[in-house]
Regions:
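Conserved PLP-enzyme active-site core in the AAT-like
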Residues: 2-4, 18, 72-268
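Conserved N-terminal alpha-helix of the aminotransferase class I/II PLP-enzyme fold
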Residues: 31, 35-84, 105-113
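Pocket-edge structural micro-motifs
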Residues: 15-17, 32-36, 51, 76, ...
Length: 372
């Protein structure tokens, strides 16, 4: 049976593990090393210096690559992965199409680092037709689907076709869905980026990033960028990520189920003005989400009546932490407008469903809504 014929939990549990060998551990531990023994030529061994490579990186890169369907390069943060994709690929006169309602750090790189170098930056909403229309002459398109925090969905295959017709490439931020919820490379994307800080690691205790591609030359350039810039992951953190992958399918299944159930429940609450979730049948991009996603992820967006009302709600929660980021086993929520980087209402709440029991989460939210 091929790997892709196996179920998601089986693939996640076995991802990146070495072949069974008598007397060796089932799961390899972290390799803590700066220099490695290297006699003779610089390429006489697979590892020579810790900034260029580490067996623990190799193991987790192999694991993510198996889930993503590509060759993966690990980075010390999601933004390091973003910069490794964007900065070497774009120069004066090139055109970058980037969604305006995705992760604000990406927009910051485009606006503050690429545009001053002569890159033409086109900001567009996460809408398939708008993105396709903006792709004329594009060198690279960057989309995030579902977008964060508004949870809009772009048709990856349609955007890939449009940018490829211009001779460009498509990169997809797949952080929210993870490779078990969506496989952008299979849909035609050239690169799939992950902030492994979030659902991929899932315990809110790591800051890491990864990029998967199918072009070996691009993978080599990503590794060179990582080494030259020092944007590396610590081996212990890389090992923790690999360890966390074994439970990814279980976590994602519970979190996605909780998120959809809460979205349906919140729609019936009189205190809630609006609910956003790609799994809802009346979501404007629901049909696209059903077609290209295997699960809809842990996020729910909903709007309360103003900033003060939203803050009272957050203050009244007991099980749910008020914190940024998302995708962890602990449910979190925040009022996104406090950052000033997202075009959302003052009372918009980004809620990340964790692995708690649904009834307990509903009771916590109900009390905070009623008392706030």
């Amino acid at each position: 049976m091929s790997d892709q014929q196996r179920g998601p939990s089986t693939r996640a549990v076995h991802a990146g593990l070495p072949p069974a060998e008598q007397g060796t551990p089932l799961t390899p531990g972290p390799v803590l090393a700066a220099p490695f023994h290297l006699q003779g030529a610089k390429d006489a061994a697979p590892y020579g210096y810790g900034r260029d490579g580490n067996p623990t990186w190799t193991a987790v890169e192999r694991a993510i690559g198996e889930l993503d369907g590509g060759e993966t390069v690990l980075f010390g943060a999601g933004m390091a992965a973003v910069c490794a994709v964007l900065e070497p690929a774009l120069g004066p006169g090139d055109v970058l199409v980037v969604v305006e309602d995705g992760y604000p750090g990406v927009r910051g790189v485009a606006r503050d680092r690429l545009a001053p170098r002569g890159v033409e930056v086109r900001f567009v909403p996460t809408d398939s037709e708008a993105i396709v229309a903006a792709c004329e002459g594009a060198t690279l398109a960057w989309i995030e689907t579902p977008s964060n925090p508004a949870l809009d969905v772009a048709d990856v295959a349609a955007v890939a076709g449009a940018v490829h017709a211009q001779g460009g490439r498509l990169a997809v931020d797949n952080t929210l869905a993870t490779p078990l919820g969506q496989r952008p490379l299979d849909l035609g994307a050239d690169a799939a980026m992950l902030s492994a800080t979030k659902a991929l690691s899932g315990h809110s205790d790591l800051v890491l990033g990864a990029v998967s591609v199918r072009d070996p030359e691009w993978a080599a350039r990503l590794r060179a960028h990582r080494s030259q810039g020092g944007a590396i992951a610590g081996p212990f953190e890389a090992w923790m990520l690999h360890r966390s992958l074994a439970t990814l399918a279980l976590r994602l299944e519970r979190q996605s189920a909780n998120a959809l159930a809460l979205a349906l429940w919140l729609r019936e609450r009189p205190e809630v003005l609006d609910v956003r979730h790609p799994g809802l049948a009346d979501h404007p991009h629901h049909a696209i989400a059903v077609r290209q996603m295997q699960s809809f992820g842990p996020l729910v967006g909903f709007t309360l009546d103003g900033a003060e009302r939203a803050q009272r709600f957050l203050a009244g929660l007991e099980l749910v932490a008020e914190a940024t980021s998302f995708g962890g086993v602990h449910s979190t929520a925040e009022r996104r407008a406090r950052w000033g980087t997202d075009a959302v209402a003052d009372g918009f709440i980004r809620f990340s469903a964790g692995c708690e029991d649904l009834a307990d989460l509903q009771a916590d939210l109900a009390r905070a809504l009623e008392e706030g």
